[in-house]
């Protein structure tokens, strides 16, 4: 809790953004990481780690090509392997679903 409040005090410039122990849960930490590490490229990995990228339990507008958002196939947890890499190394096989 103290570390989260330290980060929020730095960001807000005062303690107005501090939280209580009751507000600290996994969803809060995931959301805070999304804000704090916005340009660092961690969001997709975090969503995969917590099984939220492809599931329907966590949606955002236009997820899955639907305006209200929807779950998508689990194949999207992995990227396709480029054909140039597979041509260079015949031991590579394409990730499932691609």
Model-predicted regions and their roles:
Residues 1-98:
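Acidic/polar-rich alpha-helix caps and helix-coil junctions
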């Amino acid at each position: 809790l103290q570390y989260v409040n330290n980060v929020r005090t730095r960001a807000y410039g005062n303690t107005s953004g501090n939280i209580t122990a009751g507000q600290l849960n996994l969803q809060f930490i995931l959301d805070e990481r999304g804000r704090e590490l916005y340009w660092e490229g961690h969001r997709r990995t975090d969503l995969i780690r917590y099984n939220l990228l492809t599931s329907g339990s966590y949606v955002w507008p236009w997820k899955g090509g639907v305006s209200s958002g929807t779950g998508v196939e689990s194949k999207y947890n992995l990227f396709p392997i480029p054909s140039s890499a597979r041509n260079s190394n015949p031991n590579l096989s394409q990730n499932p679903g691609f």
